[in-house]
């Protein structure tokens, strides 16, 4: 009946979506003052009705850097097509590519969850992990990559770096 229609309509998400074109970068502040820096050809969305009231959850595709406002009562979560990152207050980057999703933690601590088995790993400042869609595994990355945030900082650094890595970093940046 009509009452059912209103119930469904009232509970339907009120999505707010922010997108960037290739080559464009955009800083977005969420309702709780969390900063999201979107890289080119990326998007995020959140439910305006529920964000910061029931939970702090966003969905994304592409590459984004998050500086999360601390709120222990409501953890912040980011979902990609295959993974989820949950935090209290920290700064980190998610880079979702067709075959792998990578998380780089700058400050604080995150829980990185992936796959149907909901495998998870805790990452702290300076740590990175990758989830491979092909082999369905999370791998903690031990070597630090100073150029992971180059798109955000505007700086690339190379010292005795193999040429293939220089080319990879340059193609990510440009």
Pin down the residues of each PLM region.
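A residue-level detector for the "anchor" residue at the start of short, highly conserved motifs
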Residues: 2-174
């Amino acid at each position: 009946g009509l009452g059912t229609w209103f119930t469904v309509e009232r509970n339907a998400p009120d999505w707010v979506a922010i997108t960037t074109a290739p080559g464009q970068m955009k800083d977005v502040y969420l309702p709780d003052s969390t900063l999201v820096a979107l890289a080119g050809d990326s998007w995020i969305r959140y439910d305006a009705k529920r964000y910061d009231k029931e939970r702090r959850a966003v969905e994304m595709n592409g590459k984004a850097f998050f500086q999360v406002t601390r709120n222990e009562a409501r953890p912040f979560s980011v979902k990609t097509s295959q993974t989820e990152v949950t935090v209290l207050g920290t700064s980190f980057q998610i880079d979702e590519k067709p075959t792998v999703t990578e998380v780089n933690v700058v400050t604080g601590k995150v829980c990185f969850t992936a796959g149907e088995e909901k495998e998870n790993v805790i990452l702290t400042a300076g740590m990175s992990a990758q989830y491979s869609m092909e082999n369905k595994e999370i791998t903690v990355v031990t070597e630090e990559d100073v150029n992971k945030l180059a798109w955000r900082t505007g700086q690339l650094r190379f010292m005795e770096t193999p040429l293939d890595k220089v080319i990879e970093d340059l193609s990510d940046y440009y």
